[in-house]
């Protein structure tokens, strides 16, 4: 028994046993397509689909989104995601494709989004059914976020966003983007806002995605 296991609460110990049993019986076979080294290098839609199927099965088994409340698609547990991650790593499972969604979008949406937004976005994010990308870097500015030029302007109840983003990994597969842009030009270090943008629905209607490599 590892030191971590010795510190498990009864609930965590039961959950760890569930993870171990499920993984022992449900690991996928050899990939039917060639997979790149990591999710951010995905370019083959068939590889993405294979990995999405794996993420959905792990999500349905309760190994992903464990610590989020049930009402937003989570498992309703406490301090259990790290246990699932450890057991998946030990079992040498495939990587999860929706890493930007899970690592960057989900926490922000959960802690800052309205209840109806969380209920709409988080279940399919955690299951991997909807892929997310990030829109931070820009031509000429790279990752210098203070030099953002993409601008969002109010138009009644809507926002109109104009600009360009680069190195938007997974954008060619994504339904959603977490987008950082300027809503005020008064101060270089202020006036930055964070948007959730449905880029797939806007393709050909103001949004263009072009792979660089």
Label for each model-derived stretch:
Residues 1-99, 120, 124-127:
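Amphipathic, small/basic residue-rich leader segments at the start of a protein or domain
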Residues 97-116, 142:
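N-terminal glycine-rich flavin-associated loop
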Residues 3-4, 96, 123-213:
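FAD-binding core of flavoproteins
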Residues 15-16, 22, 26, 54, ...:
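Tryptophan-centric aromatic hotspots in well-structured domains and transmembrane helices
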Residues 85, 106-109, 122, 196:
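Conserved protein kinase catalytic domain
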Residues 12, 114, 195:
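Residue-level signal for inorganic ion chemistry
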Residues 69, 114, 163:
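Active-site glycine-centered loops adjacent to acidic/histidine catalytic or metal-binding residues
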